[in-house]
Amino acid sequence: MTVRVSVRSRKLRRFEVTALPFAVRVYINNQVLVPASLVRALGIAHLRFADVDLEYKGFVIELRGVRLLRTRHTDARQFTIPKRVRETYGVGFGDVVRILSIRPSITNKDKD
């Protein structure tokens, strides 16, 4: 008697993002998720602070020195859109913003 057992991987593949620009929704806590695949592709897993360029309703918004928040078990990062920017441009939760670029901030050099 032969028994065949199917073994499935526990690893879920949601989506692979490896290049910018990237469109993403703003969470209810005013944070934006940068997927782990994009973090690895850009080589920014070691960064604590970054300069981020966003596009929202035709406006290009430059955020300097935003803190990249991380979880314990993944390479994904999140950052909060500052209140001043949210109020000025009307960015709210559920809105779609495009991440145009993410680059190391000068703040990284000061903190190490």
Each predicted region: which residue ranges?
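Short linear interaction segments
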Residues: 1-18, 87, 98-106, 110
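Acidic (E/D-rich), amphipathic helical modules within compact regulatory domains
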Residues: 13-62
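Exposed regions on extracellular, virion, or secretory-pathway luminal proteins
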Residues: 34, 65-67, 75, 93, ...
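A short beta-strand-loop micro-motif that forms or neighbors metal/cofactor-
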Residues: 43-59, 90-107
